[in-house]
Amino acid sequence: MAESRDGRVHALDEVAEMDLDALLPEDEIAALARRGPVVKSGPEVTRLFRVGAPFWLIAGPCVLESDALNLTVAEALARISDDLGLPVIFKASFDKANRSSPGSPRGPGVDEGLAKLARVRAATGLPLLTDVHLPEQCEAVAEVVDVLQIPAFLCRQTDLLVAAGQTGRPVNVKKGQWMGPAEMKGAANKVRGAGAAGVALTERGTFFGYGNLVVDMRSFALMRQACEAPAIFDGTHSVQRPGEGAGVSGGEPGHIPALVRAAVAAGADALFLETHPDPAKGLSDTTNMLPLARLRPLLEQVLEIRAMVRPFEWEAGARG
């Protein structure tokens, strides 16, 4: 739900039709009564970054937008966390450094972006994740967020991996679209060796010719077994059609539910889902974000599937 200056409470599917600047200003949001997320920002986040941890979720808009929108999404995630008993980490990027077109919006930048993320944490208690692109960004980012993320295109950059690990924060490394699952062992070891509190690896599809991605459902077991780290499924970037649009990536968001359900049945340890009240109006990844109103119903199905899955004794890469 979201509250506007006139005191009215709006359903999430109404938010997309609203002027988001009309939502409650940031200095009043922290005063609203809230239920807390299952895992709050702080040291307890680290326990998620081990094989056998409870199932969890990374979610949020692709890029940081207005405080009103960021907090609308974060508040919804905090309620989902509480209602479903699901640990949730809020994600959003301060800089989309690999946009297809030089004219595409990139985000607010490091300083403003970290301030926006801090306001999300103050308002909701949610743990925070954001990605880093340069080694010199890591220390400042680690002062604000709970988890650093390495983008897929940078998953072999040793200096960046080491700098992220040296912060002592947990690190999520996205698997490059050209990488095999077991090849991610090198990235995991670089981060661990530098002192990270934990490491997770995220599957986000593999190139299948030009402009297409496919997901090998064996990847979760293979990565977990080879790298001794939780294997996450990115259900939104996996439906991208890279380079398909005119200067932007395309996407097939209608396939998100099927891939997410399959990944959980195949043993994914956690999910990564970008979500927005109105993806078409987002500043980035408009063609592959999940509508915020669709998130809870999908997660309810996912948790039912997760509860049903029991590893076979001989199964490769069991969750532990």
Give the label of every model feature segment.
Residues 58-70, 88-110, 275-289:
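Glycine-rich, proline-tolerant flexible connector loops at the mouths of alpha/beta enzymes
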Residues 7-57, 309-319:
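N-terminal amphipathic alpha-helix/helix-capping segment at the start of soluble metabolic enzymes
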Residues 70-74, 78, 138, 143-153, ...:
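A short alpha/beta connector and helix-capping loop motif
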